[in-house]
Amino acid sequence: VSSGAWLSSLAQKSRLAVVCEPGRPNGAFVRSRKGRAVWEVVFRGVAAHAGNNPQDGRSAILAAARFTLEVNQLQDYSGKGTSVNVGVIHGGTVCNTVPDLCKLTIDRRCCRDEDGQAIDDAIEALALRSCGNGIHVEAKRLSLSSAMPYSEKNRPLIELVNEAARLEGFEAQWADAG
């Protein structure tokens, strides 16, 4: 169950809206949120017995490990605020078999949608480059949500919240969410 489509339809009819995203430990309200994409990348190799004929195998896990090291280089957290995290890896069945399957799940976050698109393009290019020599790769973006940056367009709403907070006797604090 998702409220995304419903909220999107309401947004088309609204001038302003307050999103009640859970606050931060210091009680700050969230004024901006990074965009996010979730990727699944599936590596298929060739199974072989690790003792009798390992040379006939093509390790999906080894290909996924190389890909993971490369995709990790796409992040620029301290500069553009982008992060790329290979957070889930599933592969292999038993330790005496060259694994023919490995699946990765990637979380990508960006402050600007254009930076996110550049990283998504790079993930696809790295997946394509990982193919060959008995390894097949399929990269699929499972979900995408746009960044919600702080801007002059949402400043009036933030000022309304600031004023409401002052009327209640406190100063609103603001944070940017990842």
Predicted feature residues:
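Metal-dependent amide/peptide-bond hydrolase catalytic core
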Residues: 22-27, 31, 37-42, 46-178
